Amino acid sequence: MKLLDVMLLHAWKCFIGVFILAAPFVASASDALPDLIARIKPSVMAVGFYQETQNPRFGFRGTGFVVAGGNLLVTNAHVIERSDDVNRESILVVHSKGDSAQAGIRRAAVVHLDKAHDLALLRFDGSPLPALELGKPAGAREGQLVAFMGFPLGSALGLTPVTHRGSVSAITSVALPSPTARQLDARAISRIKEGSFDFIQLDATAYPGNSGGPLFDLETGAVIGVVNMVALKGTRESALSHPSGISYAIPVEFVLRMLAAAR
């Protein structure tokens, strides 16, 4: 056998060996996802507003997930911006039980707002639900396999949580959109002064309804962030018709800070 043939054969054997060694790891991560979905699904809720004069009465706004004692819910601050006490508009959270017809509706109230990081903490009534495990601060790593759960298209397809997979493509500094002149107040000015902070950039497609949903590690299920926004190619409507495939999440460390401040 020629020297070149021997070298090629050796290289091929090395490749097969590496593939065989790597295969169990990939299979393990994939096999874990169905169990994680079953575990996390009961803790993910739809967030919206209820008003007697509206049609439909429940207006979906985003996603949230249960933390701490089982009656607290984390979501994005922009998801609950429209709460209007004058018009008797109430915040409601909907707990999907796998069938939108059997969804459990809970009334909720704001416990704490962190507009600087676009986070909100709600307390909902009724019996507690399973709380999700929160990861360690600064726990996200580039290349980490992740998944997120929520209601990407709202109630259009029924209020059943949907799961998407992806990876952490970067830890990057992003500034939240600046308020308009009409929205300027003490908090808004404080947010501008704070400027940008680190976001988790995802190689995955999120949709408007995913806002406020949990981003979790694909192996452990621990929440490492809160889905926040999508990079748009054009108008807001293009998020559905021409998704960019780039999404962002707020690191869990700001959720931990918010929970500590609310105590």
Protein language model regions, located:
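Catalytic-histidine neighborhood of serine endopeptidases
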Residues: 68-115
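N-terminal signal peptide c-region/cleavage motif recognized by signal peptidases
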Residues: 24-26
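N-terminal activation segment of mature serine protease catalytic domains
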Residues: 28-77, 117-119, 141, 257-262
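Active-site substrate-binding loop(s) of clan PA
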Residues: 35-36, 83, 109-111, 125-160
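Short, well-ordered loop/turn sites that connect or cap secondary structure elements
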Residues: 67-68, 86, 140, 218
